[in-house]
């Protein structure tokens, strides 16, 4: 074994001990006794409060809308991030967020009426709080780990009796199917922020006249987003379309690391304004939602951009199949679909309108109200 491999393995082993030791030392893995006193002080525990995180931003949106409904919110860093840095990151993600930011070591176990875990490691840390224990689930995390310690510990978090509230129904069905759930489990609708991505009416007939097809492609350094497969598919598609007289302009966004193959424009991480401009400039938007759906297709649909998703993902769990192009792993299938809609722009417009109509009733305000309705149905203990 070379020195580099030894260093990587030693670092990974040390980091795992940091994660696992407090769990094994402090958790007895018994089902929690979960009693709610009816109060409105909510603590939300995150590993870190970081910039440019969709998951963190969703938590801030939920918390802010709960604050508007009369709840007192505190966002807590499990790893004791600097308070000033937390506030800066929160403002970066959501400039008008409401609530307080604190490191875990500045909280006490009696500070809250409700304590909410947001990631598998945070579940074990909220056990010390004298509060109603909830688990806000944005994805089924065991999927991300190979079978072993991390997989087992993450899977166990759904079996400890916390009140689970999922962002969307897919997580609920997956957790129930995969785990021995002991506590209450509910979900709120997967929303989007309407004020940031307004619908722009397009002249779809123009696409029939153009020989250049522009696509906005979401890539991220996470396997569930297919950061290697998507560029490879598009590389073959680009070469094939060129033989048919079409130029494919690929605009990658969301990536911090270089794309695996040089076949497009690497936009990196974009602001919301830049994203909306990109969506308006492109003819199609492409994203992979293999586990719980990404927020990105909602944004694209809201802006009026036709969406390309994957048959093997969860898009059709949230939307009808008639609202997007669902491709497989073959560039030939994707090419056939794109050329069909280029030749039939009226159908592309109808698909886009159908997709947009399906999200009109969604909002963070509505989802926050659903969260409150869930709390209203919990039996309270004085």
Predicted regions located by residue number:
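A short, well-ordered alpha-helix in the C-terminal region of glycosyltransferases
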Residues: 340, 347-361, 370-373, 377
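Membrane-proximal helix-turn-helix segments that form the acceptor-binding/catalytic region
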Residues: 104-105, 147-165
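Conserved active-site histidine-acidic residue motif and adjacent donor-binding/catalytic loop
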Residues: 256, 264-279, 292-293
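N-terminal pre-catalytic "stem/leader" segment of glycosyltransferase-like enzymes
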Residues: 2-110, 215-217, 232, 242-249, ...
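Acidic donor-binding loop of glycosyltransferase active sites
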Residues: 280-292, 305
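Conserved catalytic-core segment of nucleotide-activated headgroup transferases in glycan assembly
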Residues: 58, 75, 174-178, 187-262
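A short, active-site helix/loop in glycosyltransferases that binds the activated sugar's phosphate group
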Residues: 121, 125, 144, 160-184
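Conserved acidic donor-binding segment of nucleotide-sugar-dependent glycosyltransferases
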Residues: 321-332, 340-345
């Amino acid at each position: 074994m070379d020195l580099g491999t030894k260093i990587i393995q030693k670092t990974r082993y040390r980091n795992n001990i940091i994660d696992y030791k407090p769990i094994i030392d402090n958790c007895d893995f018994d089902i929690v006794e979960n009693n709610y006193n009816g109060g409105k002080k909510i603590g939300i525990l995150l590993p870190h409060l970081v910039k440019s995180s969709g998951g963190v931003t969703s938590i801030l949106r939920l918390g802010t809308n709960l604050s508007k409904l009369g709840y007192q919110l505190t966002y807590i860093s499990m790893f004791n991030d600097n308070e000033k840095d937390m506030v800066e990151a929160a403002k970066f993600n959501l400039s008008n967020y409401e609530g307080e930011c604190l490191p875990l070591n500045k909280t006490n176990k009696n500070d809250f009426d409700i304590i909410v875990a947001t990631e598998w490691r945070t579940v074990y840390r909220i056990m010390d709080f004298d509060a109603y224990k909830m688990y806000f689930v944005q994805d089924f995390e065991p999927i991300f780990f190979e079978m072993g310690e991390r997989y087992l510990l993450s899977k166990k978090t759904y079996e400890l009796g916390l009140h689970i509230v999922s962002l969307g129904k897919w997580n609920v069905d997956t957790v129930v199917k995969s785990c021995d759930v002991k506590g209450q489990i509910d979900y709120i609708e997967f929303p989007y922020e309407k004020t940031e991505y307004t619908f722009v009416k397009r002249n779809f007939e123009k696409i029939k006249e153009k020989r250049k097809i522009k696509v906005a492609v979401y890539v991220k350094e996470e396997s569930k987003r297919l950061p290697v497969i998507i560029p490879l598919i598009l590389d073959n598609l680009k070469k094939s379309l060129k033989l048919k007289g079409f130029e494919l302009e690929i605009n990658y966004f969301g990536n911090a690391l270089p794309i695996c193959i040089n076949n497009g424009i690497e936009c990196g991480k974009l602001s919301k304004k830049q994203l909306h401009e990109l969506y308006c400039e492109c003819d199609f938007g492409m994203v992979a939602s293999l586990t719980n759906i990404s927020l990105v297709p909602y944004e694209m649909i809201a802006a009026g951009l036709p969406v390309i998703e994957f048959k093997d993902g969860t898009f059709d769990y949230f939307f009808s199949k008639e609202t997007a192009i669902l491709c497989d792993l073959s560039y030939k299938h994707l090419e056939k679909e794109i050329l069909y809609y280029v030749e039939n722009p009226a159908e592309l417009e109808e698909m886009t309108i159908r997709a947009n109509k399906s999200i009109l009733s969604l909002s963070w305000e509505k989802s926050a109200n659903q969260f409150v309705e869930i709390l209203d149905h919990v039996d309270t203990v004085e």
